Every structure is written in C-alpha cells, then in structure tokens.
Amino acid sequence: MKKLVIIPAYNEEGNLEKTINDITENAPGFDYVIINDCSTDNTLEMCRHHGFHYLNLPVNLGIGGAVQTGYRYAFYHGYDLAVQFDGDGQHSAAHLEDMAKVLEKSGADMVIGSRFIEKEGFQSSGLRRVGIRYFTMLIRLLTGKTITDPTSGMRMVNR
C-alpha cells in the first residue's frame, strides 16, 4: 500500500526538519511531500539544503490550495492513501500507522487525528477552543457523531 504524508508549509523553516525527522523515524512506511506555499522565509532553501522531497508553489495559494496540490500529487502518483500533516509540530507521526489501520479496517473514507484526546501536548487559544467546541457540537447535532477536533490539520483519506 502506497501512503503519502502531505505537509503544507508556509514559513515553516523553524519546524520542518523536526517534522520530517518525526515522519521518517515514526512512520517509515510513509512517503512525504512538502508543499512550499511560496514561503517568504528560508523554507525553500531548507528543503533544498536537506534534500527534502518538495513541490514549490510559485504563488501563495493558502492552506487549501497547498493541501489540494498535495492530494492531486498523491492521486497522480498512485498513492492508496494520503494524510494532511501540518508542518508546525502539532501532530505526532507515531499515530499515522494506527490511523491507516482504522481507515483500512473501517471502510471509512476519512480519519481525522485529534490533538485533544490526550490532555497534555498541544493547547490552542481560548477563542479557538470555543470555536472547536461549537463545531464539535454542531457536527454531533447534525450527524450523531463525535469528532473531537474538527479543525485538525491531520486528516487521512483513501483513494
């Protein structure tokens, strides 16, 4: 099974090396591609210097455009699953294999990683937490399903 980690990156020079090391150490069965979204810092130079696998967007498309570029890359290169994985260190690559197993066994089209299941680690701002709780409640009301982190930047999808 071909698996790809899509890392949208805008001005992530301070985080990318750690993120790539996390992926290569904790999810060795996954390939990765960094989508450099026309960063204004040294993100592109860092990718080149370290030999990271990357695509360089000539204009800033925003998070949506960068992620969409990554999904198109995954599709055209025959990946069976792809996961959006923010380049800022909010997520742990140690969870990727478990997510892939859930996706495969459940027959679901998407699995969303949550930053909030474990109480330590990432903490968002108060206003953002209110928004996340609102969306969690709305999704539960409309679907009957509980999604603890609907704004997560770690979403895995199948082909």
Predicted regions, residues:
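Acidic helix N-cap motif at the loop->helix transition within catalytic regions
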Residues: 14-18, 41-49
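A conserved acidic beta->alpha catalytic loop
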Residues: 36-44, 89
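Short, structured coil segments at secondary-structure junctions
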Residues: 28, 50-51
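Acceptor/aglycone-binding surface of glycosyltransferases and processive sugar-polymer synthases
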Residues: 57-59, 63-76, 81, 93-159
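Short, well-formed alpha-helical segments that are part of the catalytic scaffolds
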Residues: 11-25
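Short hydrophobic beta-strand elements that form part
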Residues: 4-8, 56
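Cell-envelope/extracellular polymer assembly enzymes that use nucleotide-activated donors
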Residues: 2-4, 31
